[in-house]
Structure formats: C-alpha cells, structure tokens
Swiss-Prot record:
Chain positions with Phosphothreonine modification: T177, T429
PTM notes: ADP-ribosylated. The ADP-ribosylation is retained in the virion during infection. Phosphorylated on serine and threonine residues.
Amino acids binding RNA: R109, R125, R167
Quaternary organization: Homooligomer. Both monomeric and oligomeric forms interact with RNA. Interacts with protein M. Interacts with NSP3; this interaction serves to tether the genome to the newly translated replicase-transcriptase complex at a very early stage of infection.
Descriptive protein name: Nucleoprotein
Sequence ranges of Basic residues compositional bias: 393-403
Compositionally skewed regions (Low complexity) per UniProt: 193-212
Disulphide connectivity of cysteines: none
Residues covered by the CoV N CTD domain: 260-383
Subcellular locations according to the entry: Virion; Host endoplasmic reticulum-Golgi intermediate compartment; Host Golgi apparatus
Annotated segments matching region Disordered: 1-62, 159-230, 271-292, 384-428
Any Pfam family the entry gives: CoV_nucleocap
C-alpha cells in the first residue's frame, strides 16, 4: 500500500474535504480559493494547477516533478545547506518513520535585470523528494550528486525506496514544510510560508479584495500548522526593529552619570548577599573594604567587579545554592537589635564555613591558580605599597619663577674695564711682540700707545 502524505485515512476526514468529480478526496485549502477562485475570473480558460518554483517557465533548471512540501529558500550568500544526521525529513500525517527518507533538490532560480542593467541571480530554493521519487528517482541513497542533500530518519531503511505516491497538483496541494522538534534549520535559509514568503503575502492581499465573506473564509482556511523549527533570524529581526525605532543595535548604550547612579542605587537596595558588583557599583561599595574577613580582590577586580574578564572562570568554582546549604557548616547567630531608627528589629546572621575542592584536572586549572594567587590577600600588598610610596609633592604656583629670580639676584656683575686697563692687564703674546717690534723699527707709534709707554 502506497502512502499519501497528509492523509491518515479517508474515513476520518469528513468536514475538511470535498469530493471531486473523479472520486478523489480533495482537500479544500486557502490556496484553492485564492488561486482558483469561485468567481471563474479566467474568462472560460481551463483552471490551471497552482504553479510552484519547480514548474515555472524560464526559472532556471525546470523540474517536471511536484514536491509534497513547500520549499526552503536561501537568503544569505555563502551558506551551506545541510542537516544533522537523523534530521531534515519533513513530517506529514500518515507517513511512518520507516518511510521518512529522501533528498533535498537544489532548484536554481531565474535571474533578473536590475534597473542599472545588470543581471542578478536569485539564490536557490530547495525541495524535498522521497527516496525513489522526483528528478533523481533512480538514484540510490547517498549517491554523490551535485545539488542533492540526502536525509533520513533514524528508523528509515535507506536501502529500499520509499513507498510514497507522486503528488498530483490537481488533487493535492503542497504541505507546509515542518520538522520534528529539535531539528536545526540551516543558517541562512527560511521555510517558504513561514512568514517571509512573498507569494503568501500577495495571495493574502488578493483575498482581502474579494469582500468580507471571502476574507473570513480565507482567514479561517489560512491557518496552517507552523514549522516547529525557527530559523536563526532573531538577531536580524531585532536589528530591523531597532533600526525602525531609530536606534543602532551595534552601538553600546551610553552610560551617563545619572544612569550610573541609578544602577548603583538599584544594586545597593538589594540585600547584601544578592548584590552583583560592576563598573557602576564596585566591590567595596557593595561589600565594604578589604581586610582579614573579606580578603579577596586585587585592584583591577575591585574596580570592575563581575565585569572583570577573569571573573567568569572563578565563577565556575562558586557553589550552587544546594551545595551552599547542604555542603557547608551553618550557624544561626542573633546579633544586636536594630539601630535607633528601628529598635524593635531583630537582626540575625547565618554564618557559614566550608571548602571548595578541585585538582589539576579541572579545565583551566593553571589560569584559576594564577587568578587566585593574584587576588587572595591582595589588600596586604596594596596597603604595604601605600606606606612605602611617598606622596607626590604638590607644585606651588610661582615657586620656580621666584627661585630663578633669586639666582639672578645672587650673581655679582663686575663693571667693564677701560681700554687702558684691559691693555695693561693683558700679557703680550709672541705674535704681539713681533708686531710691536716691527712697528718700532718703522718709527711709527700707533694711536693709544703714546700714553701707555709710561705704564
């Protein structure tokens, strides 16, 4: 007995099917009303079956076979179409797990001309065919064929063909593709009819122009079972929504002084054991200064809190709530009553002590040890360093100018000597003596030496 996807048995379908003239049970769908409307608007021409991408003319490689399921269209370039083992077979009523085997066929769609005259190729669309049907009906499961991706369920016997009848488009509409829970749809692809299908939106607009009765009937028949697989488009949709609102999803939110103050106050309003320190509310504001009883945290980690890049690996060592209560020594201690503002309030402390044991086989062991050694009792090093380093003296305005002025005042400046004094105090060099002897031999006394002869 051959199986028909979407049909469990003829007896269980009374109100949702119409009997055609040839005795074939035909399902009345929203597509029947939109594509083959009852108003007979084709002016006497024969009703044509709804064309799919596999039968459209001038659409690349024409496939003369109808798939039982709607296609999966690629919308991002460079993405690979593949499924994990045991996944990828569309589910349909009436098809047992043993027959869930087949292949996805790549249909190369047509190209179109852009306004600037360039040819642009549409990204391909994939259609599913059961093993032994479709354009590669004679191929065996796993054959290396370009544009074919083989899929099968874990219970299917891939050595035999699937006992599935070919789809007659005049009797059966294509079933919206949906997968078993847990199936991961390839990234960069979407299921036709899952919300991004242009033909669906155009058909919906046509149905709205046919009066209120047809609109109501069309909307009721339009309810198709949605695919259980959600394409990886959450980031894209969020970015589009934010762009519509005038916000940029790629830019981080700017933190102002007012917002930082609000974040800090919100953290401090929580109970002490529920606080999470960060850049806006550092560790010491949440839990107090470091000391013998709170001895963890270096300068960088105290400033960043849980925003420190090293903190996540330390969080792996933190106990769970159950480990805290059942793996620690707990003691309930009553402290002094509340302060003057609330003297009737009783204050208790749940004191605890325990240990976290790990060894060198723990992933990231060396990094954990390094971070622990840097942050345990780090307050001691910080305190010691503060005592050793002397504070930087503050510069007083005008000190340097006054010092320079004092140095100038302390310098004694001698009065310049006359030309006679300079000549008397100066010793004659051998060159001077030879020149002077030559002058005296000539009998010419130079000006300025007449009076100096007596000196």
């Amino acid at each position: 007995m051959s199986f028909v996807p979407g049909q469990e048995n003829a007896g269980s379908r009374s109100s949702s099917v119409n009997r055609a003239g040839n005795g074939i049970l035909k399902k009345t769908t929203w597509a029947d009303q939109t594509e083959r409307g009852p108003n007979n608007q084709n002016r006497g021409r024969r009703n044509q079956p709804k064309q799919t991408a596999t039968t459209q003319p001038n659409s690349g490689s024409v496939v003369p076979h109808y798939s039982w399921f709607s296609g999966i269209t690629q919308f991002q370039k460079g993405k690979e179409f593949q499924f994990a083992q045991g996944q990828g077979v569309p589910i349909a009523n009436g098809i047992p797990a043993s027959e869930q085997k087949g292949y996805w066929y790549r249909h190369n769609r047509r190209s179109f001309k852009t306004p600037d005259g360039q040819q642009k190729q549409l990204l391909p669309r994939w259609y599913f065919y059961y093993l032994g049907t479709g354009p590669h009906a004679g191929a065996e499961y796993g054959d290396d064929i370009d544009g074919v991706v083989w899929v099968a369920s874990q219970q299917a016997d891939t050595k035999t063909t699937a006992d599935i009848v070919e789809r007659d488009p005049s009797s059966h509409e294509a079933i919206p593709t949906r997968f078993a829970p847990g199936t991961v749809l390839p990234q960069g692809f979407y299921v036709e009819g899952s919300g991004r299908s242009a033909p669906a939106s155009r058909s919906g607009s046509r149905s709205q122009s046919r009066g209120p009765n047809n609109r109501a009937r069309s909307s009721s028949n339009q309810r198709q079972p949605a695919s259980t697989v959600k394409p990886d488009m959450a980031e894209e949709i969020a970015a589009l929504v934010l762009a519509k609102l005038g916000k940029d999803a790629g830019q981080p939110k700017q933190v102002t002084k007012q917002s930082a103050k609000e974040v800090r106050q919100k953290i401090l309003n929580k109970p002490r054991q529920k606080r999470t320190p960060n850049k806006q509310c550092p560790v010491q504001q949440c839990f107090g200064k470091r000391g013998p009883n709170q001895n963890f945290g270096g300068s960088e980690m105290l400033k960043l809190g849980t925003s420190d890049p090293q903190f996540p690996i330390l969080a792996e060592l933190a106990p769970t709530p159950s480990a805290f209560f059942f793996g620690s020594k707990l003691e309930l201690v009553k402290k002094n009553s509340g302060g003057a503002d609330d003297p009737t309030k009783d204050v208790y402390e749940l004191q605890y002590s325990g240990a976290i044991r790990f060894d060198s086989t723990l992933p990231g062991f060396e990094t954990i040890m390094k971070v622990l050694n840097e942050n345990l009792d780090a307050y001691q090093d910080q305190a010691g360093g503060a005592d050793v380093v002397s504070p930087k003296p503050q510069r007083k305005r005008g000190t340097k100018q006054k010092a320079l002025k004092g140095e100038v005042d302390n310098v004694s400046v001698a009065k310049p000597k006359s030309s006679v004094q300079r000549n008397v105090s100066r010793e004659l060099t051998p060159e001077d003596r030879s020149l002077l002897a030559q002058i005296l031999d000539d009998g010419v006394v130079p000006d300025g030496l007449e009076d100096d002869s007596n000196v």
